[in-house]
Amino acid sequence: MGAGMGRSGTGGGILESLPTGTPQHIAMLGLDSAGKTTALYRLKFDQYLNTVPTIGFNCERVRGGIGKAKGVNFLVWDVGGQEKLRPLWKSYTRCTDGIIFVVDSCDTERLEEAKMELTRTARSPDNAGVPILILANKQDLPGAKEVCELEKHLGVLEITGPPGTSCIKVQPACAITGEGLHEGLDTLYQLIQKRKKLAKLNRKRAR
């Protein structure tokens, strides 16, 4: 979904505008109506904004609020989730640092469709090793699937292999209230840093 405001600032003053290093590039994907844009603008403005379906993409710079991600800048590309737009996802995931895949935890009828798109994204050669955070959205609604159920329905273990080797984590969240969003961003940031450290170590060993 889209709010019709790209790259706009929050008006938070001089300190907020100061750079804090190179931003982490994040692609936010998921089926249409999963709540991607609501999550993006809740992270950006810390308030709920009514949105309309995204035709194309939204791009915003957001800042981590807790944990190791606190103060870290993220450049988040929220890409439309309609079926006709999904072939474009690969253009946004190329060279990205991490992926947020938003899932509607209540929409059981489309979980198989979400699984198919998640699997396709995770197994794309361009995305090999890229950390993925599955944002289990709409946890405030009755009938929302719990994390363990979603992991099973989405085939997370099938995608990632044995426990402990996973670059995919699931974070329960509610985009409207903001619950779980910054926790998820922090988790993804730690996965990104872990991957970068491992790559650096491997380069040293190869010398």
Locate each region found by the language model.
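TRAFAC-class small GTPase G-domain
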Residues: 1-199, 203-207
